[in-house]
Amino acid sequence: MEKFGLKALVPLLKLEDKELSSTYDHSMTLGADLSSMLYSLGIPRDSQDHRVLDTFQSPWAETSRSEVEPRFFTPESFTNIPGVLQSTVTPPCFNSIQNDQQRVALFQDETLFFLFYKHPGTVIQELTYLELRKRNWRYHKTLKAWLTKDPMMEPIVSADGLSERGSYVFFDPQRWEKCQRDFLLFYNAIM
């Protein structure tokens, strides 16, 4: 084990081991001699008040190279924007909510839940909320969860008309799944 320890490394650093000195690249262990580079920069070898790192950027810095402008092309879709490159095309509609409403109607429930939770306070959240309402999903304000009536069971309305008991399907955003359970629902707790 000693041959892999620090004791075996000391003769290598001091260049005492003649066997290894012929096959081992000592610049990998000891580093490179920077005195010639310091001399080319006009720095005396034993200057204590000047540090090399203050003037040396990087050995890979290409300061003499002129900047080359890369080849590029302008896509045709960019040239068709009004006011850009003298285009006369009618302006595109970037904020069209009507197109987004049609797209949102095609999504599955799980995708709508993802959009609802991913984009809080945006138009996308409002559109997904409206679409989920169309699909009979309601948001429970206290539980902070979405629920809908189980289509196979009709809930029983209470005598006072303020609540109903039945089987509901809840969407659990933590486990990202729909789960069914019996529940007493108060109407004032849902949106």
From Swiss-Prot:
Tell me the compartments it is located in: Cytoplasm; Nucleus
Q: Kindly provide the name given to this protein in its UniProt entry.
A: General negative regulator of transcription subunit 2
The record's Gene Ontology cellular component field reads: CCR4-NOT core complex; cytoplasm; nucleus
Further information in the entry reads: Present with 2120 molecules/cell in log phase SD medium.
- Could you list this entry's UniProt keywords, alphabetically sorted: Activator, Cytoplasm, Nucleus, Repressor, Transcription, Transcription regulation
Q: Which family does it belong to?
A: Belongs to the CNOT2/3/5 family.
Subunit field text: Forms a NOT protein complex that comprises NOT1, NOT2, NOT3, NOT4 and NOT5. Subunit of the 1.0 MDa CCR4-NOT core complex that contains CCR4, CAF1, NOT1, NOT2, NOT3, NOT4, NOT5, CAF40 and CAF130. In the complex interacts with NOT1 and NOT5. The core complex probably is part of a less characterized 1.9 MDa CCR4-NOT complex.
Superkingdom, taxonomy of origin: Eukaryota
Reply yes or no: does the keyword Cytoplasm apply.
Answer: yes
Taxonomic source organism: Saccharomyces cerevisiae (strain ATCC 204508 / S288c)
Which InterPro entries does the entry link to?
A: CCR4-NOT_su2/3/5_C_sf, Not2/3/5, NOT2/3/5_C
Q: What is the lineage of its organism?
A: Eukaryota, Fungi, Dikarya, Ascomycota, Saccharomycotina
What GO terms describe the biological role, i.e. biological process, of this protein?
deadenylation-dependent decapping of nuclear-transcribed mRNA; deadenylation-independent decapping of nuclear-transcribed mRNA; nuclear-transcribed mRNA catabolic process, deadenylation-dependent decay; nuclear-transcribed mRNA poly(A) tail shortening; positive regulation of transcription elongation by RNA polymerase II; protein ubiquitination; regulation of cell cycle; response to pheromone triggering conjugation with cellular fusion
Disulfides per UniProt? none
Described by its record, this protein's role is as follows: Acts as a component of the CCR4-NOT core complex, which in the nucleus seems to be a general transcription factor, and in the cytoplasm the major mRNA deadenylase involved in mRNA turnover. NOT2 is required for the integrity of the complex. The NOT protein subcomplex negatively regulates the basal and activated transcription of many genes. Preferentially affects TC-type TATA element-dependent transcription. Could directly or indirectly inhibit component(s) of the general transcription machinery.
- Which Pfam families does this entry report, sorted A to Z? NOT2_3_5_C
Q: What is its main location?
A: cytoplasm
Any coiled-coil ranges, and where? none
